[in-house]
Amino acid sequence: VLAHERQARIAALVGERGVATVSDLAAELGASESTIRRDLDRLHEAHRLVKVHGGAMALERAHLTRDLTLPDRYGLHAGEKDAICRLAATLVGPDDFVYLDAGSTVEALASLLAPTRAAFATNSVSTALVLAAKGLRVIVLGGELVDATKALSGPDTTEAIARYNFTLGFWGTNGVTAEAGFTVQDRGEAAVKSAALARCARPYVLADASKLGKRSLITYAPLEAATLVTAGDVPAQWRGREGVVVADAAGIGDNGPVEDGEPGR
């Protein structure tokens, strides 16, 4: 079996099962464990799965239970993220003071922003650099740097947030359910998200359809605390729900374009 064929089979098996061990993959594919480990290295580098001790985990499952690095997240559901961010970008007005959460979806939004008088604040180093490269006004909140996500976190971050009053804000999430609301896996991340959302007049959470119905470890806000903007294969129970906007490929909400700073419902 050629290496690329074996790796494709490994990626498919891990995707189907959510998690697989090196020994199980070796037995199923008739390859040595050392060969499987090398294949997992290649697949991890290609962002097709996440290599963990003793095996591998599907990206979607890993995203709910551990912090993926930003490169791991960039390739996930790119089309859906683009649709979400196109809609979100239309919400930013020239007089807004906008909070931008750390994460790949919100960073993608930053890359789509047009020149504006609006001011921005973020706890994401990478998002701050995107904004600065566009010549936009950006405040970088202090705190301890989390290398995997390039986010600033901790009490210094939440104290800085408490000084500001945001007119608009955008957050990411690992999962969202009606019962648990918006969830992440890290307490420090949840604390920063909650603190910023509490200081925001018009909060939006950006999450592609793969995160709907998924629950991570810690709730940072109930579902009704923010408008959810989503895209992709959205289940029927989420469509038409109050506070949920489904964006199409052109960045238009399911009930029409954004008007007067509020999304179509």
Stretch-by-stretch model annotation:
Residues 2-12, 16-23, 30, 45, ...:
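Conserved phosphate- and dinucleotide-binding cores of soluble alpha/beta proteins
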Residues 105-109, 212-215:
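Short glycine/serine/threonine-rich phosphate/pyrophosphate-binding segments
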Residues 104-105, 127:
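A generic "binding-loop/recognition-motif" signal
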Residues 2-99, 110-115, 119-120, 132-136:
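HTH-adjacent hinge/linker in prokaryotic transcriptional regulators
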